[in-house]
Swiss-Prot record:
Disulfide-bond pairs as recorded: none
InterPro entries: MATE_fam, MATE_MdtK, MdtK-like, Multidrug-R_MdtK
Transmembrane segments: 16-36, 53-73, 93-113, 127-147, 160-180, 188-208, 243-263, 276-296, 314-334, 350-370, 387-407, 418-438
Family to which the UniProt record says this protein belongs: Belongs to the multi antimicrobial extrusion (MATE) (TC 2.A.66.1) family. MdtK subfamily.
Compartments, as annotated in UniProt: Cell inner membrane
GO cellular component: membrane; plasma membrane
Membrane disposition: Multi-pass membrane protein
Name of the encoding gene: mdtK
Residue numbers on the Extracellular membrane side: 37-52, 114-126, 181-187, 264-275, 335-349, 408-417
Keywords for the protein's UniProt record, in alphabetical order: Antiport, Cell inner membrane, Cell membrane, Ion transport, Membrane, Sodium, Sodium transport, Transmembrane, Transmembrane helix, Transport
An annotated Gene Ontology molecular function: antiporter activity
Stretches assigned to the Cytoplasmic side: 1-15, 74-92, 148-159, 209-242, 297-313, 371-386, 439-457
One Gene Ontology biological process: xenobiotic transmembrane transport
Protein name in the entry: Multidrug resistance protein MdtK
């Protein structure tokens, strides 16, 4: 019991800064929306449309680079810290290549925006302008993620938190300057949010790079002169590990986007109630997501030390803590669902629907916690390909079709409306949780030599 208690303390120490870093990141998006809305409703809508395209594109690159965390954690645990610098440099090369692809996609996103049904031309122009300003921040964001993953792989999660709040503090005044045109800068409205956010990502990267260069705990890692050439072998391995994670993230983001599109014809009340429940459940998701990041670090580190039993302890402790947290947040959601809905909207019909959907959200919080922590465990074991197959099967083969049938057809029961899609979420997330646990159990039953061999690749 003592080893589980000790492991829980380690996990909580790692996850709290990750939570706060995510809060800072979410707050930046909130600030952009509010400040653009203060300028005009059109500018706020433009930022919202632009963000809906930016997120899938940049999260694909973000997911690809998540492969660095277990690689660095494993090297750190095995005492091969001299190899970390080379891995990080290849991470920067990979981030640079991905940045070019993301920027090309975002530059041409105007074709997607202008093809939207009945979109106002002025709104479309502002959304395109916002994206074309924001895309210059893509390299800064991805370079920052490489540096952050280096720190987190070394079990140092506080720098990411500090840089997140630094970015938030810089974002507010720079937004103000470019939205309203102060200090000789042009008045750009919502497009100014894109300029400010792009600048903030570069500030965060430069600040994180400065920390890494001067941190005493990383002196032994700075052992290569010059930046070095791309290493095709290392980059191929990072892509093999990271691409399934990137695709899994992409499938998850696009699933919720597709459901939002399917709900939109059902009416204003249904759309508003769905959006309230989804926004609140997204806030609750920060808790298990941060724990999953901590579990990846601990499992990778323990495997690097050559201890498969300690890796199992880290995995089981993470699941136990995650389930306990999910039960608490589910009770909180059920108890206060009407009060929470009233914080978003005071329309009685919207509040009633949102409260009903939050009951379903409370049910899936436990499954959601298990599946995201399970994904973190599998990343720690460097078994990322299974994450892709599980996510695709659970969300797109089981969850979305069943949600569509329940919500919009009479094949099984009378049309359920938005609640049908939430039943689909429950089916998809529960399926993912079960499949993640089965895969974890299969991996942990393999001989230690095979587990350690995979982890060392």
């Amino acid at each position: 019991m003592q080893k589980y208690t000790s492991e829980a303390r380690q996990l909580l120490a790692l996850r709290i800064p990750v939570i706060l870093a995510q809060v800072a990141q979410t707050a930046m998006g909130f600030v952009d929306t509010v400040m653009a809305g203060g300028y005009s409703a059109t500018d706020m809508a433009a930022v919202a449309i632009g963000t809906s395209i930016w997120l899938p594109a940049i999260l694909f690159g973000h997911g690809l680079l998540l492969a660095l965390t277990p690689v660095i954690a494993q090297l750190n645990g095995s005492g091969r810290r001299e190899r970390i610098a080379h891995q990080v440099r290849q991470g920067f090369w990979l981030a640079g290549f991905v940045s070019v692809l993301v920027m090309i996609v975002l530059w041409n996103a105007g074709y997607i925006i202008r093809s939207m049904h009945n979109i106002d031309p002025a709104l479309a122009d502002k959304a395109v302008g916002y994206l074309r300003a924001l895309l210059w921040g893509a390299p800064g964001y991805l370079f920052f993620q490489v540096a952050r993953n280096q720190c987190e792989g070394l079990a140092k999660t506080k720098p990411g938190m500090v840089m997140g709040f630094l970015g938030l503090l810089v974002n507010i005044p720079v937004n103000y300057i470019f939205i309203y045109g102060h200090f000789g800068m042009p008045e750009l409205g919502g497009i100014g949010c894109g300029v400010a956010t792009a600048a903030v990502y570069w500030v965060m990267f430069i600040a994180m790079l400065s920390y890494i260069k001067h941190a005493r705990s990383m002196r032994d890692i700075r052992n290569e002169k010059g930046f070095g050439k791309p290493d095709s072998v290392v980059m191929k391995r990072l892509i093999q590990l990271g691409l399934p994670i990137a695709l899994a993230l992409f499938f998850e983001v696009t699933l919720f986007a597709v459901v939002a599109l399917l709900v939109s014809p059902l009416g204003i009340v249904d759309v508003a109630g769905h959006q309230i429940a989804l926004n609140f459940s997204s806030l609750m998701f920060v808790l298990p997501m941060s724990l999953a990041a901590a579990v990846t670090i601990r499992v990778g580190y323990r495997l690097g030390q050559g201890s498969t039993l300690d890796a199992q302890t880290a995995a089981r402790t993470g699941l136990g803590v995650g389930i306990c947290m999910a039960v608490v947040t589910a009770i909180f959601t059920v108890t206060l669902r009407k009060h929470i809905a009233l914080l978003y909207n005071d329309n009685p019909e919207v509040v009633a629907l949102a409260a009903q959907l939050m009951l379903l959200a409370a049910v899936y919080q436990i499954s959601d916690s298990i599946q995201v922590i399970g994904s973190g465990i599998l990343r720690g074991y460097k078994d990322t390909r299974s994450i892709f197959f599980i996510t695709f099967t659970a969300y797109w083969v089981l969850g979305l079709p069943s949600g569509y049938i329940l919500a919009l057809t009479d094949l099984v029961v009378d049309r359920m409306g938005p609640a049908g899609f939430w039943m689909g979420f429950i089916i998809g997330l529960t399926s993912a949780a079960v499949l993640m646990m089965l895969r974890m159990r299969y991996l942990q039953r393999q001989p230690s030599a095979i587990i350690l061999q995979r982890a060392a690749r």
